[in-house]
Structure formats: C-alpha cells, structure tokens
C-alpha cells in the first residue's frame, strides 16, 4: 500500500492572511436559526426576534463576512419566500434537512 508523508514548518510564512477571509454562514440546520439566532419571545431577544446574546457572541468572534443563506440549506432556498410580511410567507419542506421551513427568518431579518 502506498504511503505519504507531510512535513510542516510552522516558522515558514508566505504572507499574512487577510482578515476578510474569516467569514462564516448561517444555515437552517438543527437549532442554528430557530431557537438559536432567531427566537421571538425569548427574554434575550430584541424587538425583531434576534437573540442579543447570540449576536454579541458572534460579534466577539469577529467574522468579516456572514453569508445567508449558507450551507446545504441553500440548495432549495427560494429567496422570495423570505421577504415580505411574515404572515404571508409560505411554509415549505426543506429538502436539505427534511424539515418544515416556516420562512419566519429570511432575507429581510438577516
């Protein structure tokens, strides 16, 4: 069986890494959005339903770019479903995670 080896030199640097490369994304997996970032009625939620404690921790991490939607969720995301009055937004089956997407958190809230 072939083998491979790798030698790393921690002292070797080509150039500094630009901070704008440290981005992240928001995905509707598990409780990342609903009951995570967005939870209307929670004691720590602001008037729009966003959790102020989660936002503070996110700011502390300091991502330079946050993409929404992100991850596998984007494969069947319809941006039109996440805008406009929440009561008029459709509920759909999220094909990525086989769950119901209420679209209560969408592009407008992001």
What are these regions (language model features)?
Residues 1-110:
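Non-catalytic accessory regions flanking glycosidase/transglycosidase catalytic cores in CAZymes
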């Amino acid at each position: 069986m072939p083998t491979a080896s790798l030698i790393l030199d921690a002292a070797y640097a080509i150039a500094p890494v630009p901070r704008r490369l440290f981005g992240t994304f928001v995905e509707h997996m598990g409780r990342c959005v609903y009951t995570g970032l967005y939870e209307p009625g929670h004691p720590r939620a602001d008037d729009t339903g966003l959790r102020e404690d989660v936002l503070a921790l996110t700011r502390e991490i300091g991502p330079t770019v946050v993409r929404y939607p992100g991850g596998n969720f984007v494969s069947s995301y319809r941006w039109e479903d996440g805008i406009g009055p929440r009561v008029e937004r459709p509920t759909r089956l999220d094909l990525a995670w086989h769950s119901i997407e209420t679209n209560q958190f969408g592009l407008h809230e992001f």
